[in-house]
Swiss-Prot record:
Described function: Hydrolyzes cytidine or uridine to ribose and cytosine or uracil, respectively.
GO annotation terms (biological process): nucleobase-containing small molecule interconversion; purine nucleoside catabolic process; pyrimidine nucleobase metabolic process
Organism of this sequence: Shewanella oneidensis (strain ATCC 700550 / JCM 31522 / CIP 106686 / LMG 19005 / NCIMB 14063 / MR-1)
Active site: H240
Lineage: Bacteria, Pseudomonadati, Pseudomonadota, Gammaproteobacteria, Alteromonadales
Protein name per its UniProtKB record: Pyrimidine-specific ribonucleoside hydrolase RihA
Gene: rihA
Length: 318
């Protein structure tokens, strides 16, 4: 059974790898790629999505840029993590095609409306575009199968002590999404910090004889630099965004629990916090499936086997 998807991303090293992972699997049918500001400015994240799709020879997938800033706040970017381009490291090709002359929200609505099956949305950046879609197209809610997002944490944050970056950038958007009533899978830091790629994993990827695997290895070489800071306590680099795709492909790799999740939009200390009611203390019904555990080796094996699919025949099939 195929699963139609729309990836809403802010590439970003781990966004790029999530996109590459998704497009290696024919069962995931990409209806569109949309971009948001976050890891870099909106012009750069849009260009990066086009560059990755050019590398994969997937100019058939429509692409559109989204909101230039959060719903109610100034833009924050993570250039300290992802570099000046947002994808520092490999020599990526220039885009071979142009984005659609419509907004991300318009493209998502168009593709959801046309789809014969409910569509799964996969946002791996701030949730601005998804919130705008839900607010402006309530008639399409029933055609959205699920939102599988990377964001939040039941424990500590990575941008502030309380908040994960994607949610902190646009907490008002996250609040809209989590209150939407649409099924949500939350891939937060609790699980993504377990999805660490080690040096030996990067060498395993580098040994795969195709240009896509080479690109991923070089992306990871750069991504490792930031995460070697001892303050994080990491052995490797956490691949946050690919957890969304891995859960869709192999949910058995993950431990999950249905929880109520609320978004803090007011507090000076905890702005952007995802308040996860793991012990049912609020009495509120669950609104998200929250991922807590991961089979790391199974995750790495899935990534490696997926990258091996990008043979010359596969890349030139269109």
């Amino acid at each position: 059974m195929t699963c139609p998807i729309i990836l809403d991303c802010d590439p970003g090293h781990d966004d790029a790898i999530a996109l590459i992972l998704a497009l290696a699997h024919p069962d995931l049918v990409p209806l569109a790629v949309t971009t948001s500001a976050g890891n870099q400015t909106p012009d750069k994240t849009l260009n990066n999505a086009l560059r990755i799709l050019t590398l994969l020879n997937r100019s058939d997938i429509p692409v559109a840029g989204g909101a230039a800033k959060p719903l109610a706040r100034d833009l924050i970017i993570a250039d300290n993590v992802h570099g000046e381009t947002g994808l520092d490291g490999p020599a990526l090709p220039n885009p071979s095609f142009s984005p659609q002359a419509i907004t991300a929200v318009e493209l998502m609505a168009q593709q959801i409306r046309k789809s014969h099956q409910p569509v799964t949305l996969i946002p791996t950046g701030p949730l601005t575009n998804i919130a705008l879609l839900l607010a402006s197209h309530s008639e399409l809610h029933d055609k959205i199968e699920r939102i599988v997002l990377m964001g939040g944490a039941a424990g500590v944050g990575n941008w502030t002590p309380a908040a994960e970056f994607n949610i902190f950038v646009d907490p008002e958007a996250a609040d809209i999404v989590f209150k939407s009533g649409i099924p949500i899978t939350m891939c937060g830091l609790d699980v993504t910090h377990q999805a660490q790629i080690m040096d030996e994993d990067i060498e395993r990827i580098r040994a795969i004889p195709n240009p896509v695997a080479k690109c991923v290895a070089e992306l990871l070489d750069f991504f490792m630099i930031y995460h070697r800071d001892p303050k994080w306590g990491f052995v490797g680099a956490p691949l946050h965004d690919p957890c969304t795709i891995a859960w869709l492909l192999k949910p058995e790799l993950f431990d999950a629990q249905d929880c109520w999740v609320g978004i803090e939009t007011q507090s000076e200390l905890t702005l952007g916090m995802t308040v996860v009611d793991r012990y049912q203390l609020t009495g509120k019904p669950a609104n998200a499936t929250v991922l807590f555990g991961l089979n790391r080796q199974g995750f790495v094996d899935l990534l490696v086997h997926s990258l091996a699919a990008y043979t010359p025949t596969y890349l030139n099939r269109r």
